[in-house]
């Protein structure tokens, strides 16, 4: 009787992975890592530029606010006023522009406004007066306590110092009544009365918003 013999063969060796496949996977990993670093760097740089620009804009606005505040006198902000005449059909040859000298404007009397003001300035000093205005006819803002005002010497109309100074540099007469302190009418051209002038100013709106 014959005996069967069982022969066991060893498993075949594993197939070797080509080296170019291994190097290709390493290259992909390096490329992905570099791309990720570039993306992160771009985001950080963009954020820095945006923050820098925002700070510069804030610094510029703060500098402008400080410059405007430096011209204030007891709470009065220098107004930026543009006067536009409603009747623009006049020929340019007939329009005469003139104003007063700085020394003449400075010679006009100044005083501090009070709520119970009952005196106006004349050539001899103070005397009682009635019907005093509480609103500047140039900037259309109410006078605040202790604000510095300047008065026209003839008609006794008074306004904010900066408002009247800016007006008199361009016009030699009162903004309300056209009265001129100069003796000869030829030396001071007739200016557009305030009732026919439209003041375009941010001063009034800013003052009203600040009081709310």
Curated annotation (Swiss-Prot):
It is found in: Membrane. It holds the Pfam family zf-RING_2. InterPro entries: ATL67-70, Znf_RING, Znf_RING/FYVE/PHD. Residues 185-195 have a biased composition (Low complexity). The keyword NAD does not apply. A zinc finger (RING-type) spans 136-178. One of its GO terms (biological process) is protein ubiquitination. It catalyses: S-ubiquitinyl-[E2 ubiquitin-conjugating enzyme]-L-cysteine + [acceptor protein]-L-lysine = [E2 ubiquitin-conjugating enzyme]-L-cysteine + N(6)-ubiquitinyl-[acceptor protein]-L-lysine. Its EC number is 2.3.2.27. It is a single-pass membrane protein. Keywords: Membrane, Metal-binding, Transferase, Transmembrane, Transmembrane helix, Ubl conjugation pathway, Zinc, Zinc-finger. PROSITE patterns: ZF_RING_2. Pathway: Protein modification; protein ubiquitination. It comes from the Eukaryota. The keyword Membrane applies. One of its GO terms (cellular component) is membrane. It is an enzyme of class 2 (transferase). The chain crosses the membrane at residues 24-44. GO terms for molecular function: transferase activity; zinc ion binding. Residues 182-212 are annotated as: Disordered. Belongs to the RING-type zinc finger family. ATL subfamily. The RING-type zinc finger domain mediates binding to an E2 ubiquitin-conjugating enzyme. This is RING-H2 finger protein ATL68. It comes from Arabidopsis thaliana (Mouse-ear cress). The gene is ATL68.
